[in-house]
Amino acid sequence: HPNLYKNGKVCLSILNTWNGDSWTGCQTISSVLLTIQSIFTNNPLINEPGITHIHKDFYDYTEIIRFKNIVVSTLAVVNNSDKRYSNFQHLVKIARDDFLNNFENKIGIFEISKKEYELFKNNNKTKEITCSIYKMSCKIDYITVKSLFKLVKEKILLLDIDKN
């Protein structure tokens, strides 16, 4: 997200980190948290100053974020393939249960994302897209990721059988 940084900083005008409505004494922690919550949208780049839907990299940025969210937040966590999640096993279990219980819905969302990407790019081939904003690039391959979704589901089901 363009307003959230790896080091934990949050860029919001009400925190005096950018031009715009700045901090006043009448604001509370609730108003700050509500502002932070409001920036979580399907198009986070729209929160960047000077960026609109017609910016040349708007769609590419959005597509990279959408695809990486599928890969990282779903597959990496549910597959538990990253050691960084070792301290969060109780949350990984919740994510796995959600993944299994909502698998068909997730595949449906995945298919919608794939179709939107294909319409935008006028093809269905694997393609690397780049975005000058933040110098991002990503190889978009929904076909492979869909296969990975199915493999991860099978792996989880096998692990659950082994535990019982």
Locate predicted features:
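E2/UBC-UEV (E2-variant) core
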Residues: 1-44
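Charge-rich (especially acidic), low-complexity segments
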Residues: 46-164
